[in-house]
UniProtKB/Swiss-Prot annotation:
Has 3 domains, the large (RuvB-L) and small ATPase (RuvB-S) domains and the C-terminal head (RuvB-H) domain. The head domain binds DNA, while the ATPase domains jointly bind ATP, ADP or are empty depending on the state of the subunit in the translocation cycle. During a single DNA translocation step the structure of each domain remains the same, but their relative positions change. Its EC number is 3.6.4.-. Homohexamer. Forms an RuvA(8)-RuvB(12)-Holliday junction (HJ) complex. HJ DNA is sandwiched between 2 RuvA tetramers; dsDNA enters through RuvA and exits via RuvB. An RuvB hexamer assembles on each DNA strand where it exits the tetramer. Each RuvB hexamer is contacted by two RuvA subunits (via domain III) on 2 adjacent RuvB subunits; this complex drives branch migration. In the full resolvosome a probable DNA-RuvA(4)-RuvB(12)-RuvC(2) complex forms which resolves the HJ. GO terms for cellular component: cytoplasm; Holliday junction resolvase complex. The gene is ruvB. Signal peptide: none annotated. The RuvA-RuvB-RuvC complex processes Holliday junction (HJ) DNA during genetic recombination and DNA repair, while the RuvA-RuvB complex plays an important role in the rescue of blocked DNA replication forks via replication fork reversal (RFR). RuvA specifically binds to HJ cruciform DNA, conferring on it an open structure. The RuvB hexamer acts as an ATP-dependent pump, pulling dsDNA into and through the RuvAB complex. RuvB forms 2 homohexamers on either side of HJ DNA bound by 1 or 2 RuvA tetramers; 4 subunits per hexamer contact DNA at a time. This is Holliday junction branch migration complex subunit RuvB. DNA binds at residues 292, 311, 316. Its main location: cytoplasm. Residues 183-253 are annotated as: Small ATPAse domain (RuvB-S).
């Protein structure tokens, strides 16, 4: 699958860029106000008790700031953070090596925690509850269990699939925080801040236009801003103006709802070739040349959220709203 401008996952070349934009304190973090308010209380209370923060589960769509929040938690608690991904912890020994290296109060951030193997997850349970590990050494008759005491720590788990977590793992998190899509006002503020970091000016209309097309996701907003800045610099404009913004977004094929050419391809397939549906997911996948899981995990959620697509027992179906939007878009292109 080619990388899309509106893909909410991080592109391979964006790591350093995203790091440069990330706030380091709660007061700098834009949006997610309910989460910020709760975290301020939880962190202050933990520090007053001289205890680690309870284990925290962050969940929601990609690109909304789960990794950023994990680092902010460590900064606010004034401790170190160790970051790993769920799939990288293949054996109990991998987890034991990391946990035994933590200092009291440290944060362990596990991204994609829903992808932990079952054997690693079972070893994690006593570590989360009672701060010890039971490790089996040897095989067969010579196998024996060794208990390793751990310093108190905070586990921050992040997932885009909270429903895929097992009940025992989910229940061991004392704090559950769901990140929501950002409103246009917060995205506009993020875009203006990013433009300052990039050293470029941007007019108000452009910031609003980019916010509208960013799919409620700061990562998408920053990516679109970078590409619009390319057009501004080639045009030798003193700042980003609305005319350049609309021209650039048109060439990038990102419409006013944040939908790109793949979204249009999928919806036109359902509307034109299958009379609006219902049509099976496998049929759509074959018709547009994409994998079923990619459609289900990457393309569908936003189309459903915007009210253009409906899941039914018989397959996917275009909504009346979709007919209006995509018919108009097709007329404008013709």
């Amino acid at each position: 699958m080619n990388e899309r401008m509106v893909d909410q996952s991080m592109h391979s070349e964006e790591t350093d860029f995203e790091l440069s934009l990330r706030p380091t304190r709660l007061r700098q973090y834009i949006g997610q106000n309910s989460i910020k308010s709760n975290l301020e209380v939880f962190i202050k209370a933990a520090k007053l008790r001289h205890e680690p923060l309870d284990h925290v589960l962050l969940f929601g769509p990609p690109g909304l700031g789960k990794t950023t929040l994990s680092n902010i938690i460590a900064n606010e608690m004034e401790v170190n953070i160790r970051t790993v991904s769920g799939p990288s912890l293949e054996r109990p020994g991998d987890l034991a090596a990391i946990l035994s290296g933590l200092q009291p109060g440290d944060v362990l951030f596990i991204d994609e925690i829903h992808r932990l193997s079952s054997v690693v997850e079972e070893v994690l349970y006593p570590a989360m509850e009672d701060f010890f590990l039971d490790i089996i050494i040897g095989k067969g008759d010579e196998a024996r269990s060794i208990r390793i005491d751990l310093p108190p720590f905070t586990l921050v788990g992040a997932t885009t699939r909270a429903g895929s977590l097992t009940g025992p793992l989910r229940d061991r998190f004392g704090v559950h925080l769901r990140l929501e899509y950002y409103n246009e006002s917060d995205l506009k503020e993020i875009i203006i801040r990013t433009a300052e970091v990039l050293g470029t000016g941007i007019d108000d209309e452009s910031a609003i236009e980019l916010a509208k097309r960013s799919r409620g996701t700061p990562r998408v907003a920053n990516r679109l801003l970078k590409r619009v800045r390319d057009f501004q610099q080639v045009n030798e404009d003193e700042q980003i103006y609305i005319e350049t913004t609309k021209h650039a977004l048109g060439l990038l094929q990102v419409d006013q709802h944040g939908l790109d050419y793949i979204d249009h391809k999928m919806m036109n397939c359902i509307i034109k070739q299958y009379n609006g549906g219902p049509v099976g997911l496998d049929t759509i996948a074959v018709t547009i040349g994409e994998e079923r899981i990619t459609i289900e995990d990457v393309y569908e959620p936003f189309l459903i959220q915007k009210g253009f697509l409906e899941r039914t027992p018989r397959g996917r179906k275009a909504t009346p709203l979709a007919y209006g939007h995509f018919a108009k878009s097709n007329e404008e292109r013709e």
